[in-house]
Amino acid sequence: MKKLNADDYIDILNDVLKDICPTDSEKEELKIFSDKIISKIKDISKYPVLDIIQVGSTARDANLKNDHDIDIFLRFEKETDRDMLKELGLKLGKDVINYFNGKSWIEYAEHPYVSGEIGKFNLDIVPCYDIENCEKIISAVDRTPLHNEFLLNAYENNDLSNDIRLLKKFLKGLGIYGSDLKTAGFSGYLCELLILKYRGFLNLLSAVQTWKPKHSIVLDEIYEMYDLKKDHDFLKFNDSLVVYDPVDLNRNVAAALNKENLCKFIFYSKMFLKKPSKEFFYGFYKKTTDLLNQRKRGYLITLEILRPENIVEDVIYPQMEKIQKSINKLVKEHDFEYLQYQNFADDNTCYLSWEFLIHELPDVKLRIGPPVYSEQGVLNFITHNEHYFVKECNVCAYKTRKYKNIQILFEDIVNGKLKNIITYPKYVCPENAKIRLGTFIERK
């Protein structure tokens, strides 16, 4: 691709930046309040907390306007008992939020941590262990302070804050920002590493033009940090995009990104560079989806399944995907073609939706067997099929369909008649689900 002329994009990007950059007063207010939180934790802490660190985008001036999230990590010595780490982390978190008359609750990752609201500020107070780069983690969040330290050092000679904001807003517009298992997109940390690698938003979009699935990225800083040669043999990953974590070379930062979302990023990056527009940054995915859905629809079916209590999205979405793919395999085996499928969960219900190209089939189907010269294959075929005949060069037979209407197949699913064929995950069971015809629930 020819070299970009930044002047072709500068007006659009500046307009977007006016919308998404926090004001100086907003930044100052956030810093003052964060310092108060950290100071208070130090005051009330009578426990072996080695360090109290603010991490995340607000700590690195990489947040969007009106993002008032404050992430505080409490680092404990590696010898600290897990139960004690959990107990002390929860107590400190609750105590400091209560001191500021806030509202607190417990969230769950590998171990529980405290989240809360104090006015317009959202807080996460998370205990972790003090580890070094490439040291084996003890808990899943132990790398986060190291990520923060690496990025702050990298930004000392690189002012990339606005480029990071542009990338985040661009990905939000495309509906692919977020590394949760529901979104399967780009995490904030991944965004920062990509901007650091290519030294700018437009440079990144230009580089993306040559990407294909399985593309691999190693930051220049990694070679310097670990004194590695350029031909170093890194661990191989089988993911859509591979971005090596500077603080743990055995980890792929882009592991959560699925193939479709990577390809959306590649495609719409090309579209933006060819025909730049602010539209890409503002609900572009939703507008595009709404336009596509104005067409005449196929045959729509949704299964409504009761969602178990206290099962988080990072558990429920992979299980919905698993059961839906198992059902997809079954409907294909019975010759029903679908145009699309989606899943979505609200607080009470899991929705599995399909749009079928055809919902009713003839009573009979043609079963094509082996070529007539395949002696053993033909013998097996005629043993299991009556009324066989030759069509072109294959022995064939007509079979009566078990399901000629897709609705009947789904009724057997919810009545439990196909439970030996479909793979049931633990928390999403289609038995006794409600079938809604003519309805397709979009993921929100």
Swiss-Prot record:
Cofactor(s) annotated in UniProt: Mg(2+)
User: What chemistry does it catalyse, as a reaction equation?
Assistant: a tRNA precursor + 2 CTP + ATP = a tRNA with a 3' CCA end + 3 diphosphate; a tRNA with a 3' CCA end + 2 CTP + ATP = a tRNA with a 3' CCACCA end + 3 diphosphate
Quote the EC number.
Answer: 2.7.7.72
What biological-process GO terms show up in the record?
A: RNA repair; tRNA 3'-terminal CCA addition
Where do the annotations place CTP binding?
A: 57, 60, 147, 168, 177
Q: Which residues cross the membrane?
A: none
Provide the disulphide bond pattern.
Answer: none
GO MF annotation terms? ATP binding; CCA tRNA nucleotidyltransferase activity; magnesium ion binding; tRNA binding
Where Mg(2+) binds, per the record, is at: 69, 71, 124
Q: Which residues form the signal peptide?
A: none
Q: Which UniProt keywords apply?
A: ATP-binding, Magnesium, Metal-binding, Nucleotide-binding, Nucleotidyltransferase, RNA repair, RNA-binding, Transferase, tRNA processing
Q: Which InterPro entries match?
A: CAA_C, CCA-adding_arc, CCA_tRNA_nucleotrans_2, NT_2-5OAS_ClassI-CCAase, NT_sf, NuclTrfase_I-like_C, Polymerase_NTP_transf_dom, tRNA_NucTransf2
Q: Which residues are noted in the entry as ATP-binding?
A: 57, 60, 147, 168, 177
- Other noteworthy facts: A single active site specifically recognizes both ATP and CTP and is responsible for their addition.
Q: How does it assemble?
A: Homodimer.
User: What is stated as this protein's family in its record?
Assistant: Belongs to the tRNA nucleotidyltransferase/poly(A) polymerase family. Archaeal CCA-adding enzyme subfamily.
Report the function annotation for this chain. Answer: Catalyzes the addition and repair of the essential 3'-terminal CCA sequence in tRNAs without using a nucleic acid template. Adds these three nucleotides in the order of C, C, and A to the tRNA nucleotide-73, using CTP and ATP as substrates and producing inorganic pyrophosphate. tRNA 3'-terminal CCA addition is required both for tRNA processing and repair. Also involved in tRNA surveillance by mediating tandem CCA addition to generate a CCACCA at the 3' terminus of unstable tRNAs. While stable tRNAs receive only 3'-terminal CCA, unstable tRNAs are marked with CCACCA and rapidly degraded.
Protein's name in the database: CCA-adding enzyme
Q: Which organism is it from?
A: Methanococcus maripaludis (strain DSM 14266 / JCM 13030 / NBRC 101832 / S2 / LL)
